[in-house]
Amino acid sequence: MSYQAEYIWIDGTEPEPLMRSKTRIIKDGKEPEIWGFDGSSTNQAPGSNSDCVLRPVFETPDPIRGGDNRLVLCEVQLTDFTPPTNTRAAALGVAERYADMSPMFGIEQEYTFFKDGRPYGWPEVGYPAPQGPYYCGVGGSKMPGRQIVERHTQACLDAGLAIEGTNAEVMMGQWEFQIGVLPAPAIGDQIWLGRWLLHRIAEDYGVEVSFAAKPIPGDWNGAGAHTNFSTKQTMEGWDAIVTCCEALGTRVTEHVTHYGKGIEDRLTGKHETAPWNKYSWGASDRGASVRIPWAVEKAKKGWLEDRRPNANMDPYLVTALMIDTCCSALAGDKPTLFVPSQTTPAPAEASV
């Protein structure tokens, strides 16, 4: 007998990578091994030297096919085993450097359903009722997409992902799922696999999933990926939380440059955001760059929430940056990742 292994990877499309997958039939008793693909068709290699390598890094049961079938998330490498479009390696390296601090993450992944070029459930002409009743709402026409959300949630559970919850978001057609609490790069692995499952399940309904930061211009909420972060030190005391919050304010441009496409469109100071170029932090403040949950402020220990990452962010880059900035500050080191150069695209000057 044999089983099906769905090899899943992140391609090299810019500025937002796409997810790709293909099926391999493997004999029972054998594990998924490295495989290959045509990188010239995924923006990861030239046509004259197009072979790329898929190296398995994370496997789960396949909740769609069932049985003994598997999902296999892969790193992409060239045939010399270097990873030019693979950001997972950066997250792994900095996580190992500060492993003694136990940096951990929970990510709130927002997204928007689309059908026929409009947010799912919106009228063919015009707009739905203003924002207000949709966030965590219930009832009929207000909550389009719930069937997909329910199937996705169960699929994540069946796959063994660390899904913590789901909810409808502020704009009609917008939802969220949460993954955590996990270290890096495992949190990135599970976010990417959760995204793939969402795309795959939405296919069955003729619905598309968008992770665009500001899918609809105007007086509508954007879509983010609020990233909750803790270390052994922050879980033990308030001073470490303050150190992390202050450290994040010293590298504003470095962070927002790598927090996803369209950061200036979403982080405007409206719709529960802080301006992208003005850093702030505070307790219970959803208009701050970094929020301290009320329970954390009361206990004087716990975690912080960076509200700046977009829904389309690369979780490997975001977690690598947060570990580098926060843990280096706690250790009295200098951060080493993603120091801007003349070739680094960045928004205009940021301030604290």
Swiss-Prot record:
Catalyzes the ATP-dependent biosynthesis of glutamine from glutamate and ammonia. The keyword Signal does not apply. ATP binds at E164. Two forms of glutamine synthetase (GSI and GSII) can be found in this nitrogen fixing bacteria, GSI is a typical prokaryotic glutamine synthetase whereas GSII is similar to the eukaryotic enzyme. L-glutamate binds at E272. Its main location: cytoplasm. It catalyses: L-glutamate + NH4(+) + ATP = L-glutamine + ADP + phosphate + H(+). Induction: By nitrogen starvation. Coiled coil: none annotated. It comes from the Bacteria. Keywords: ATP-binding, Cytoplasm, Ligase, Magnesium, Metal-binding, Nitrogen fixation, Nucleotide-binding, Stress response. PANTHER family: GLUTAMINE SYNTHETASE, GLUTAMINE SYNTHETASE 2 CYTOPLASMIC. Residues 87-352 form the GS catalytic domain. It is an enzyme of class 6 (ligase). Mg(2+) binds at E108, E110, E169, E176. The keyword ATP-binding applies. This is Glutamine synthetase. It comes from Frankia alni. GO terms for biological process: glutamine biosynthetic process; nitrogen fixation. One of its GO terms (molecular function) is ATP binding. Its EC number is 6.3.1.2. Its cofactor is Mg(2+). Residues 3-82 form the GS beta-grasp domain. Homooctamer and homotetramer. One of its GO terms (cellular component) is cytoplasm. It is found in: Cytoplasm.
